């Protein structure tokens, strides 16, 4: 029995969704909270940030460093190169970079301005100061606690739930901050302009229908600065990844093997941006859901398609609203770190944005999302490292295939694996 006989004709899903002014405000605030610049892989940077803050609280250079971290942090830091360290990898290297040369006020750009002399100091510090690393058994999925000591003094700083959310500070046993979800840096990242905006925007307002409607009707002046920065930063690192020798050079392999059709370029450039980033490229990216790789994946394929099809700047930015918000919507229930590969949700979201960019509405976007998730949903996260680039290429390919399936009248149905209806 074929699919059409079993399930009936290919169904349309179009329906009208009206967004309120408050919905528009919330969607824009979500983007402002999420689409922030980061320098290097966000987990090592979060560790460097936490360590820099601990040194600041201590008030002197530590002579002993104790790092406690959740399993997700450990797997995402152990194999990735920490930028501006001369190629160093690992948890102690990230912490040492923050302690020696970090500026905690710069948040996710905490080690963006490390000098060559400071790189030497980081290496010397690692050789001369004892570091210990322990797994946290009772914390959040994203959890870091750095304890620093010098003579009779000590300081403890804890970051939890989000990459720059400091929830605990103590010096010599005196608690200075305890279990707060907001801090100066988090407020800076959210670019809050009122006290009410200190609390993170309500992600439960997001829906696929609402996202598509928002992309059609949003006042771009409220978010264009974020999106234009994403285009500039993320396409820049993708170009560098293609032109230079980074990581496993997945992007170059794809282009050399399959040519430069738009689908191959979309996969290749996204992969190349990740390869560069995972291998210590000293360029910033605009992140999504706390991840630079996801930020690259939701944006670069859409940029490639916009260039290929000569789309206007406005059309590109509206498509990026789709990819960014769908990725955030998917990740909201999963969390910023998990055993699930975040490139999957980002690649699926990119496919949805391409469908929207090429004239699709909720029907095209929804079917693209279901089809693409059904293809790549089983990929696990085994840490941040160069092979992320290959996973990104596969996920972008699944996103595009999901859309092409829709265009050819094909779809996955309920009871097909993860698909429920």
Features from the language model and the residues they span:
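Conserved phosphate/anionic-ligand binding catalytic regions in large, soluble enzymes, centered on
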Residues: 37-53, 283-299, 341-345
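Signature of multi-pass transmembrane helix bundles
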Residues: 126-280
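Acidic-glycine-rich active-site phosphate/pyrophosphate-binding loop
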Residues: 16-28, 61-73, 261-280, 312-330, ...
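Early transmembrane hairpin of solute transport permeases
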Residues: 45-148
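Glycine/charged-rich beta-loop-alpha catalytic/anionic-binding loops adjacent to active sites
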Residues: 27-36, 73-82, 276-287, 327-337, ...
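Membrane-embedded translocation segments of transport machinery
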Residues: 260-264, 277-310
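Hydrophobic alpha-helical bundle architecture
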Residues: 54-57, 83, 305-318, 322, ...
